[in-house]
Curated annotation (Swiss-Prot):
Family statement: Belongs to the RNA polymerase beta' chain family.
Organism for this UniProt entry: Onion yellows phytoplasma (strain OY-M)
Gene symbol of the encoding locus: rpoC
Name assigned to this protein: DNA-directed RNA polymerase subunit beta'
Binding-site positions, Zn(2+): 189, 191, 203, 206
Protein purpose: DNA-dependent RNA polymerase catalyzes the transcription of DNA into RNA using the four ribonucleoside triphosphates as substrates.
GO cellular component, one term: DNA-directed RNA polymerase complex
E.C. number(s) listed in UniProt: 2.7.7.6
Length: 1353
């Protein structure tokens, strides 16, 4: 800023008259005059006017001189060394430069921060950080030095008093003292003087600062301890960090700390050795004999002395040398010690800081004390713990002054140590005296305030309750459009209160107070204002549990009467909601940005596809399916009806379709005939294709189309580009209406209709296919409109159909008794064989069970054949609206075999069906399964929720951060086969991914797809047609990004069908995609009503957990460790058969594998085997597979096994989601040899850190470190996260904070969780962009512009 601008008169700055007067009186006429004063002088001269002048001082960087800013000499010296001449330079300096300069002097930096706070200035963050938090470079944690704790403090707490029980005012120097922590009432001191002036003035009488009461939430105090105290975290947590550091056994160290034993510091004339631990008796004897000629200490003092005497550098050298000389067992303990010593040496921590002379006192706002009725107080338990410390500390002080006996003082010191232990972590200190008297449980210590679901991290930082929210029961809103929801007026009037007040102020030109008065009257003006403000203002609806991102979506509110929220029936599958009493929460996005995001990204009509597999998630269900099924039924006139009242019903049917084969000019003529009861919805009629606005071939347009009125009505909702849908086939949907349905002029229509088979009606599956096809061709908005049409048709025609269920619909299977007699005869035969000794009990049981299974299947088949096409129950099942074949078999056939409580099949089946009624014994055996279903549901829902939580935690920092990482590696995929069946096709696996190399036609050599080109559906079809079986694709598993992943390796975002955008939080989406069906799998168990079935969920979820947690599998399979040939399989010794394999390169070398008895062998003699191939049935141990076959094979195995579990339950999840989880399981490496790096052999570090260490060695031409990949379970992977905040908020909070504090760990805030915890924007979506991208070059501002800006502030 040029100097001449400082000669601007203060009168041009539009300041208030009293302020201008004060400036004039102080001799300040121009901006330059401010430079003649220090900040403190300006504050005293201007008093309350200082706050009005402050923005001007900031804009013009005044006072200019650094000496005038009330900074200490130390601060000014550091700033001068950085080349800063004045205040303007300081304001333009980046935060990174300042933090680096003040790294060794945090107290001086605090002073600088106070200055920035006063000026409301935040130094800009360096933009060399490519990714992560916008506002902060990093978050660091370390041990606090005693001086720092005193520096944080605003005063020493010396009294254990809290609040005066008569006046309810805090006691002086007590735990709630106003002098230390700030006033209880805004700008009012302890002697009740009020002063609404500028901050930072103190009452002359009581010494309390006149300031806001909110400072009581941030100001800390301290307690000066009379004796040093060991921090319990470093002593009592396992493994004890102090014991490892000092190389003393934990038990012995505890004895020293709790004053049981002594440690020799200086042996003097005694026979003791330094660091030798001696008992009380030995100490007394030595003291008696040698007096002060030797030094032995006990308690924390002794530990502090030992730590101070520790020479870190020397110890490191000695330990590193002894590493190579010792046995494996000793090496492990040396590495543990070395790790801790290195941590202290490399960080700015000192080991003696683990022993405390002073402890901080939490601000009283965070540990309140509230008076209750009847003179009692409700208080936070931490207050009791502080009181106990103060009591004991004061007592110790008194005893020391009185020179009490050594034993008494020692006992008091031990009690003080225990009191401080209880404050920091009371869970580990299970002493009776630290219990809550009323509830007899340990008091809640500071550690408990952080730990677990109710702790600070998970309860208050990662999830908060929000204002402008409501909750109500949901009911169906069939009249709503796709993007709407019905909000009760009573709720909306409160939810939209701020917007209504603003509207009232605008329309009536009144102030806030008057607007509030009108609002409280709730008259017509207010309701009219509400109608205005809800227009175009989306709201968010959420149903718990929110299993995936579709569990919270945006809607346009439509005001309704009543008290229930109305929900569009098509969105229920996404929320997994039904209308049997479910409740939903509603939230109002307040800012314009939030409203824009809700409308563009979260609106229901924009979220039609499921992120886990790209299939439509808004499929019609129940009544809607049934209505459309009924609408598209096609019936022949000459059909004969067999069941009850056959003759009459056949006659009615023929009369209904008496005009079959009639010709109509257009749909309206057909509708008129229907209204006049000339034809039925299902009657087969002819119509000219020209009358229908859909796609036909030229040849078809010359003929007549055979269809029904129902199908004409259904096709009316399709766009002109679609073919006319006359049958539920893929050909009709994708290509054209089949020519078979067209009648050439001159053909006999009756003959034509006789030969023509009737196509099936449109069921749920086909409706989904139509929606998917529609979505590919049209925009999202068009799709949502079409879905609304399907819904309206469905409800209308299911009402017209009037489909009901009656007893008459359920007819028992006619051949049932004969079949039962046959199977019973066969079972008698099996029993005879067993009695004659031809069968073992297990074989007999297996045969009997198979007989009953087969007979149930036979009855099921026969029953389905006997069902009439117009049977209402059959229609419900066939359409996919409700119920399955199994349900009908139980209703009308036989219930079949049941499971007992252990999950084994009971041999005696339930022969009756529900229609016939069950015997008491049959009913009893049915109850086991039903109960198991209910308990399974409850248990597995929790289990699945926990799995989702772990998955989210392990992947939360995976975000798409760049377009391409230029990886040259690929992942070869092929169709997934399980038990001879294809479970995931090659097309499904490659669609929406990028090719990692050129793919050519095997015969013609023509290029099908180039490297790094997207494989679309048509390209994927070309690859399949070319009979290519294996395709190399770009994969997340081979991504080169240091943090997050790149768009090319991820491919298409399944929720939008477009290439994934930078900033998409793909990690969380992957975790939700795998976790959400996990809950569905568990919940589906009870739908079969406990009927014995092979695919019960119990295999599902535990298996997924076993894979993701890398546990040893139960039925472990044996795998080959080499490439070779099976020489022989020796089964002679039936106890333990063995397989002999010879090596491929050396046929004379044999490897023998001894098998468990009775295992299924999967290989035969002379078979070739490769490393990692299964030799016996069972599950492979992942760690073994990784060791034998390498990373790629292990990754491939996990991917396939997870897919098998989900496909068995008919859930399809895209590979890319599972790949993200696997990517996180392989992110660490085990150091085998450290080379010249500072790494320690035997430790596990992330691949990124390993690469960095080796790159450094390459540059310096030194020896590289060697490591091998390891596989981590998702829980361990989460806990090993680079982010200490993310790991600490997941599990084992104290353990992670202990290690992080010792190492002085830095969290670079790359993940989502850590940014949520510190209250910043998450580095995903719009938050991923660098601040530099939002900055535009500006013209230098003129003085008048700056003055204007100041006035606005």
């Amino acid at each position: 800023m040029s100097d001449n601008r400082l000669f601007t008169s203060v009168e041009t700055l539009n300041l208030s008259s009293p302020v201008l007067e004060k400036l004039k009186l102080s001799g300040i006429n121009t901006l330059e005059d401010f430079n003649t004063f220090t900040l403190e002088e300006l504050r005293l001269l201007l008093q309350e006017a200082f706050l009005e002048v402050l923005p001007i001082l900031k804009n013009f960087a005044l006072p200019r001189n650094l000496q005038n800013l009330d900074l200490s000499e130390a601060v000014i010296n550091i700033l001068t060394e950085l080349g800063m001449e004045d205040f303007q330079d300081l304001l333009q300096t980046k935060m990174a430069v300042l933090t680096k300069a003040f790294e060794t002097n945090p107290l001086a930096f605090q002073k600088l921060n106070d200055l920035f706070k006063l000026y409301n200035h935040f130094p800009s963050i360096s933009s060399d950080k490519e990714y992560g938090s916008r506002d902060y470079d990093y978050f660091k944690i370390r041990l606090a030095a005693p001086e720092e704790i005193r520096q944080w403090s605003y005063g020493e707490v010396t009294s254990y008093e809290t609040i005066n029980y008569r006046t309810y005012k805090p006691e002086i120097s007590g735990l709630f003292c106003q002098k230390i922590f700030g006033p209880v009432v805004d700008f009012q001191c302890a002697c009740s003087k009020k002063q609404v002036s500028i901050k930072s003035q103190f009452c002359n009488k009581c010494g309390v600062e006149f300031t806001e009461t909110k400072v009581r939430r941030e100001r800390m105090g301290h307690i000066e301890l009379q004796t040093p105290i060991v921090h319990t975290w470093y002593l009592n947590s396992s493994p004890s960090r102090l014991a490892i550091l000092l190389n003393i056994k934990t038990k012995q160290l505890e004895e020293i700390v709790y004053y049981v034993s002594y440690v020799v510091i200086d042996p003097g004339k005694t026979e003791f050795k330094p660091k030798e631990i001696i008992t009380e008796t030995q100490y007394s004897e030595a003291l008696y004999e040698f007096g002060n000629a030797f030094v032995a200490l006990t308690g924390a003092e002794a530990v502090k002395k030992l730590l101070e005497n520790l020479n870190l550098e020397k110890t490191i050298k000695v330990l590193r040398k002894s590493l190579s000389e010792n046995s494996k067992q000793k090496r492990e303990s040396i590495i543990k010690r070395l790790e801790i010593i290195e941590s202290f040496h490399q960080s700015d921590n000192k080991p003696e800081w683990m022993v405390m002379d002073v402890i901080p006192v939490l601000p009283p706002g965070l540990r309140p004390m509230v008076p209750l009725d009847g003179g009692r107080f409700a208080t936070t338990e931490v207050n009791d713990l502080y009181r106990r410390i103060l009591n004991r500390n004061n007592r110790l002080k008194k005893q020391m002054l009185q020179k009490a006996p050594r034993l008494i003082i020692k006992n008091e010191k031990r009690m003080l140590q225990e009191a401080v232990d209880a404050l920091f972590d009371n869970a580990k200190t299970s002493k009776k005296n630290v219990n809550n008297v009323e509830k007899n449980r340990p008091l809640k210590s500071l550690s408990e305030m952080l730990r677990g679901k109710q702790g600070r991290f998970r309860q208050n930082l990662l999830g908060k309750r929000v204002d402008y929210s409501g909750r109500s029961v949901i009911i169906v809103g069939p009249d709503l459009e796709m993007h709407q929801c019905g909000v009760p007026r009573e709720m909306a009037i409160i939810l939209f209160k701020p917007f209504i007040l603003k509207k009232l102020q605008e329309t009536k030109g009144i102030d806030k107070k008057n607007a509030n008065t009108i609002y409280e009257k709730m008259n017509e003006e207010v309701w009219n204002a509400l109608e205005e403000v809800v227009k175009e203002h989306p709201v968010l609806l959420n149903r718990a549990p929110t299993l995936h991102r579709l569990g919270i979506q945006a809607f346009d509110p439509k005001l309704i009467d009543g008290k229930a929220i109305r929900l569009h029936p098509l969105v229920t599958p996404a929320f997994n909601a039904d209308f049997d009493g479910d409740q939903m929460a509603i939230y109002v996005p307040l800012s314009l940005e939030a409203q824009a995001e809700a409308r563009l990204l979260m609106l229901v009509s924009n979220n039609i596809l499921d992120p886990k597999n790209g299939n439509p998630v808004v499929t019609p269900s129940q009544d809607m399916v049934l209505g459309n099924y009924y609408l598209t039924i096609e019936e022949k006139k000459d059909r004969t009806i067999n069941s009850y009242d056959a003759a009459q019903r056949t006659a009615e049917h023929q009369y209904k379709h008496r005009n079959e084969g009639a010709f109509f000019a257009d749909i309206n003529e057909a509708k008129t005939a229907y209204q006049n009861k000339e034809i039925h919805l299902h009657t087969r009629i002819f119509i000219k294709p020209q009358a229908i606005n859909l796609s036909f071939t030229e040849e078809q347009r010359q003929k007549y189309l055979m269809t029904t009125l129902g199908k004409l009505i259904f096709n009316d909702i399709l766009p002109p580009s679609f073919p006319y849908i006359n049958e539920p086939t893929q050909f009709n949907l994708d290509v054209k209406t089949p020519d078979a349905y067209f009648l050439a002029p001159g053909t006999n229509p009756k003959q034509f209709l006789k030969k023509l088979p009737t196509p099936k009606p449109f069921n749920k599956k086909f409706l989904s296919m139509i929606i998917a096809c529609f979505f590919k061709q049209m925009k999202i908005t068009e799709t949502s409109k079409m879905l609304d049409h399907i819904k309206n048709l469905g409800f209308k025609y299911s009402t017209i159909a009037g489909i009901t269920v009656s007893f008459a619909d359920i007819n028992t299977y006619s051949n049932k008794q004969e079949l039962l007699q046959e199977v019973e005869a066969r079972n008698i035969q099996i029993e005879t064989w067993y009695n004659d000794g031809f069968l073992t009990d297990a074989e007999r049981r297996r045969l009997v069970i198979n007989e009953w299974k087969n007979i149930r299947d036979e009855i099921q088949e026969g029953l389905m054949k006997e069902f009439q096409q117009d049977n209402h129950i059959f229609m419900m099942s066939e359409s996919g609206a409700r119920g399955s074949v199994s349900n009908f078999t139980q209703l009308a056939g036989m219930r079949g075999l049941m499971n007992n409580p252990k999950g084994e099949i009971i041999e005696v089946p339930v022969k009756a069906s529900f229609r016939e009624g069950l015997k008491v014994s049959e009913f009893f055996i049915s109850t086991h399964g039903a109960r198991k279903g209910s308990t399974d549901t409850a248990l597995k829902t929790a289990e699945s929720g926990y799995l989702t939580r772990r998955l989210v935690d392990v992947t939360q920092d995976i975000v798409v951060i760049k377009e391409d990482c230029n990886s040259d590696r690929g992942f070869v995929v092929e169709a997934m086969i399980s038990d001879g069946k294809e479970i995931v096709s090659l097309k499904q696996r490659i669609m929406g991914r990028f090719a990692s190399c050129d793919i050519c036609h095997p015969k013609t050599n023509a290029l099908i797809i180039a490297r790094n080109e997207l494989i679309t559906e048509s390209k994927a079809q070309e690859i399949i047609t070319a009979k290519i079986k294996k395709v190399p694709i770009r994969s997340i598993l081979t991504c080169n990004c240091e943090y997050g992943i790149c768009a090319k390796d991820y491919g298409v975002n399944l929720a939008t069908n477009k290439l994934v955008e930078i900033g998409e939080a793909v990690g969380v989406i992957a975790a939700q995609s795998i976790g959400e069906p996990g809950t569905q799998l568990t919940m589906r168990t009870f739908h079969t009503g406990g009927v014995a079935s092979a695919s019960d969920i119990t295999q599902g979820l535990p298996r997924i957990e076993e894979l993701f947690e890398v546990r040893k599998p139960k039925g472990k399979a044996l795998i080959s460790e080499l490439k070779g040939k099976i020489k022989k399989i020796d089964k002679i010794r039936s106890q333990n058969p063995e397989i002999v394999i010879t090596e491929e390169n050396d046929p004379d070398t044999e490897h023998r594998y001894i098998l468990e008895p009775n295992v299924d062998i999967l290989v035969s003699k002379n078979n070739s085997v490769y490393p990692g191939q299964k030799l016996t049935s069972g599950s492979v141990d992942l760690k073994e597979l990784l060791r034998v076959a390498g990373t790629t094979e292990a990754q491939k195995y996990i991917l396939e096994e997870v897919q098998k579990v989900y496909r068995a339950q008919n859930v399809y999840i895209s590979d890319k989601h599972i790949e993200i989880i696997i990517h996180q399981m392989f992110k660490q490496i085990l150091i085998i040899d450290e080379g010249d790096t500072q790494l320690l052999p035997g430790t596990e570090i992330t691949i990124n850190n390993f690469k960095k260490a080796n790159l450094k060695m390459l540059e310096e031409n030194k020896l590289l470190a060697v490591g091998r990949p390891i596989i981590l379970g998702i829980t361990r992977s989460s806990l090993r996260s680079d982010s200490l905040l993310s790991a600490a908020s997941f599990q084992e909070t104290t353990k992670i904070l202990i290690d992080a504090a010792i190492k002085g760990k830095t969290d670079h805030l790359y993940g989502l969780k850590e940014n949520v915890i510190i209250g910043g924007l998450i580095p995903a979506g719009t938050g991923i962009l660098e601040t530099t991208l939002f900055k535009y070059p500006k013209e230098p501002a003129t003085t008048s512009e700056l003055a204007e800006k100041t006035n606005q502030n």
